[in-house]
Amino acid sequence: MEHHEDLHLIVVSPESTLFDGKVEIVTLPGELGSFSVLYDHAPLISTLIKGEIKYTEDELEKSIGISSGFVEVRDNIVSACVEI
C-alpha cells in the first residue's frame, strides 16, 4: 500500500509571496551546503546563501533563484524568507 505525504512550502520576499503550496521535496542552498527536506523532517532553522530553492510539485521540478535568506522547518511546513 503506497502512502504519500506532502510538505507545505512557503517562500516569501519583502516584495511578494513567491510560492505557497504543497511539494514532495525541497532542496535549499544552506551556508554549509545544499540540503533537502522531505516529509517528517526534524525541525530546523538555517541561513540560506545565493543559489536556488528547488522543489518538486506534482512530479515537476521547479526552482526559485535567491541571493540570501533564512528558512524554518517545523511540523511539515518549510517557511523561507528570501532576497531575490
PLM features: residue spans?
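Short, charged, intrinsically disordered terminal tails
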Residues: 1-6
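Compact, glycine-rich, soluble single-domain proteins
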Residues: 7-84
